[in-house]
């Protein structure tokens, strides 16, 4: 499993990084592959984001940003974790509540 460290201080930086990483896994064009996201809430407070990339032939890859843990976990279409990004600097999960 590939583990790296990145500084992604804003939510937009985080989205862009996840989109590029998921597309690179299956050699997809980010301009042609939409990224969907959903808010993860724990005890009524936002704590992360769930990302899903839909590719050709019903291909779906996923990423989970665990805001409190400052890391992003990446999963392939079979559910196998293939990478992790640890954030040296990341957005505040509470920003998503606004």
Roles of regions detected by a PLM:
Residues 25-28, 32, 36, 63-65, ...:
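General "foldedness" signal
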Residues 69-98:
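A short, surface-exposed interaction/processing loop segment used at functional sites
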Residues 35-71:
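Amphipathic, interaction-prone secondary-structure segments
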Residues 14, 18, 22, 50-51, ...:
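Generic hydrophobic secondary-structure signal
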Residues 1-49:
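Negatively charged, low-complexity tracts enriched in Asp/Glu with abundant Ser/Thr
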Residues 9, 46, 56, 91-93:
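Proline-rich intrinsically disordered, low-complexity coils
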Residues 5-7, 53, 74-76:
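Surface-exposed beta-strand edges and flanking loops
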